[in-house]
Amino acid sequence: MAVKIRLAKKGRKKLALYDIVVADQRAPRDGRFIEKLGNYNPNTNPSTVVLHEDKVIQWLFNGAQPTNTVKNILSSQGILLKRHLQIGVKKGAITQEEADKRFLVWKESKTQKPGKFKA
């Protein structure tokens, strides 16, 4: 059973909202899913993303593959960086404190940069 982290469409026509879910890749897009990990609202400026980070990282470690869109969302939220740093901690390449420090430096640099769109 191949498990994917993907978007499930909610909302109405021309005002779509998406749930970020873990589902079997053979299941319908809006149908059966294993677990809901968060939601994504592309209608706001900037887009709103709410995630349960611990659950997402756990599913990534268990082998779930994100789709391209979800991979971009996770990357912008820093989830993939956090997972990458945790792999380094497990292998003994860096300590947990150093991983936390690197993540905080990344998060601070991201908040200081101006966004793509100005309101």
UniProtKB/Swiss-Prot annotation:
GO CC list: cytoplasm; small ribosomal subunit
Keyword Ribonucleoprotein: yes
GO BP of this protein: translation
Gene Ontology MF annotations: structural constituent of ribosome
InterPro entries in the cross-refs: Ribosomal_bS16, Ribosomal_bS16_dom_sf
Keywords: Ribonucleoprotein, Ribosomal protein
Disulphide linkage map: none
Keyword hit for Ribosomal protein: yes
Family (UniProt): Belongs to the bacterial ribosomal protein bS16 family.
NCBIfam families hit by this protein: S16 (TIGR00002)
Protein name as it appears in the record: Small ribosomal subunit protein bS16
Source organism (scientific name): Amoebophilus asiaticus (strain 5a2)
